[in-house]
Regions:
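Conserved N-terminal phosphate-binding loop of PLP-dependent enzymes in the Aspartate aminotransferase
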Residues: 1-277
């Protein structure tokens, strides 16, 4: 919703369903009931072109999609001849410990949206899909002014050559171990009264700021962002209530640099508890 503000009229109709995840308390059953209501009240299932899912929500707070729901949705799409599209722009290329995050869901999408890591920071996006779908497009029928930029494509090829599964697994596992162990240390020490849950998977992690009653603490997150910025660490918020810190470092970050960033974050969390009380 925050990204729709001041954008103007959006193409439609587009419908949204609850995102079932262990990180937000929405169950698979609740999401499936919402889908049943959607097709009973809002739209005829025969008018649906596709479902778009994020295996791990990015702006939503690094929430992991429920496996049971993903598989039920895949079966539903197969039964109704609806395309299933996986948005892997943030989660793709090893962020979650696997080349693509949808792998952990036990499904295969019809189309995959890629970007960000695909070219090592050079602007490039891509759509990957089943041959039977993409071969239906006429040559040159899908493009844009800057499509096929040769420098960006060369950067992507070099990046993909470097991104072997072995490298991705090692890089992702190292980051995950560092982040999870540090978070667990903070929890055991009760570092901050606002330290909430750790969301996400692999090296794609979010740290929730919450009040004592479990409610989101977006004001404290705003304070934390300022403290971190003054200490030389740039952080970004996420989540519906903008109360979750995104940890999304380059997979190639040196271990010492990652630890330095976590050290700064630790100090800022301590200061946050002092200035907010």
């Amino acid at each position: 919703a925050p990204y729709k503000q001041k954008v103007g009229v959006l193409p439609g109709p587009v419908f949204h369903l609850p995102f079932p995840s262990r990180d937000n308390g929405v169950t698979c059953g609740e999401a499936l009931k919402a889908m049943d209501r959607l097709f009973s009240v809002e739209i005829d299932v025969n008018d649906v072109a596709c479902f778009i899912i994020e295996p791990v929500q990015g702006e939503g707070g690094f929430l992991t999609l429920d496996v049971e729901f993903a598989q039920a949705l895949r079966r539903f799409c197969d039964e109704k001849s609806i395309l299933l599209i996986a948005d892997e722009i943030q989660s793709g290329f090893g962020r979650t410990g696997q080349r693509f995050a949808f792998s952990r869901l036990g499904i295969e999408p019809d189309l995959i949206l890629l970007g960000k890591s695909i070219a090592g920071g050079v602007p490039l996006g891509a759509v990957v899909g089943r041959k039977s779908l993409l071969d239906n497009l006429p040559k040159g029928g899908l493009g844009g002014t800057y499509s096929g930029n040769p420098i960006a494509c060369a950067a992507a090829l070099a990046t993909l050559d470097e991104m072997t599964d072995e490298h991705l697994n090692v890089w992702g596992a190292q980051q995950e171990e560092a982040i999870v162990s540090r978070y667990e240390s903070w929890r055991s020490k009760k570092l901050s009264p606002y330290l909430g849950r750790l969301t996400g998977v692999g090296a794609m992690r979010g740290i929730e700021l919450a009040n004592a009653d479990g409610s989101p603490a977006p004001q404290q997150l705003t304070q934390l962002l300022a403290l971190a910025r003054d200490a030389g660490l740039l952080l970004m918020p996420s989540g519906k209530s903008r109360h979750i810190i995104r940890l999304l470092a380059p997979l190639t970050i040196e271990a010492a640099v990652l630890e330095e960033g976590l050290d700064i974050l630790e100090g800022c969390l301590v200061k946050l508890g002092q200035v907010s009380h």
